[in-house]
Every structure is written in C-alpha cells, then in structure tokens.
C-alpha cells in the first residue's frame, strides 16, 4: 500500500481535491566505510566524481522516500505534496537524508 502513495514536489495535484493531514518525514542515515574513504581520498587528489558516495546518496534518497511513503500511509494519506529533500553530514563520517512534505487525503 505504501508504494502506491503519490509523491510530488508540486503544491497541487491537478484535478484532485484533498484535505491536509499534516507534515510527514522519511529519514535515513548511512555511515561511510574505509574502502569508500580510501577511494575518495585518491579521487580527491586527481579530481572527478566519487561514485561510491554518489551511490550511497542515491540509495539514501530512495530509502528516505520509501520511509516517507510508509509514514504517510500509516497516517491515512493518499499522497504527499510539496516533497523536498534535505541532507547533511553527522560527525564527519555519516550522511543523513530527509525526505519531507505534506501528507494529504483525497476527497472524492
């Protein structure tokens, strides 16, 4: 059921009326590992994309959206509008990604 929750970055869903349930979040935090750090250190010398970190952030983003959908479903929502991401480092070796928005329920 949670995977059926519509998630959009827009404020409105054309052709749909809904009531606001409230704010909803999906959070994930991942730690870096020694292999990634070693590769990142080498890559920072020569420049270029650090694919291991890009992959970690992409995975974190996907997990945070899945958790956002699950939390919205538990609130009785059909959709999440105005979804945004925020991310940051924790203690220099962890990365946190938050997906957040407004949970809404469609009015038929």
Curated annotation (Swiss-Prot):
Signal peptide: none annotated. InterPro entries: UPF0145_dom_sf (IPR035439), UPF0145_YbjQ-like (IPR002765). HAMAP family: UPF0145. Belongs to the UPF0145 family. This is UPF0145 protein LJ_1287. Gene3D superfamilies: Hypothetical protein apc22750. Chain B. The lineage of its organism: Bacteria, Bacillati, Bacillota, Bacilli, Lactobacillales. It holds the Pfam family YbjQ_1.
């Amino acid at each position: 059921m949670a995977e059926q929750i519509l998630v959009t970055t827009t404020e409105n869903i054309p052709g749909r009326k809904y009531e606001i349930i409230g704010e909803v979040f999906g959070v994930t935090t991942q730690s870096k590992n020694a292999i990634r750090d070693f590769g990142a250190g080498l890559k920072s010398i020569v420049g270029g994309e650090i694919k291991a970190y890009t992959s970690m952030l992409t995975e974190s983003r996907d997990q945070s959206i899945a958790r956002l959908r699950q939390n919205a479903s538990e609130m009785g929502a059909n959709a999440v509008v105005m979804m945004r991401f925020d991310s940051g480092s924790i203690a220099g070796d962890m990365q946190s990604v938050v997906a957040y928005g407004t949970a809404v329920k469609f009015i038929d």
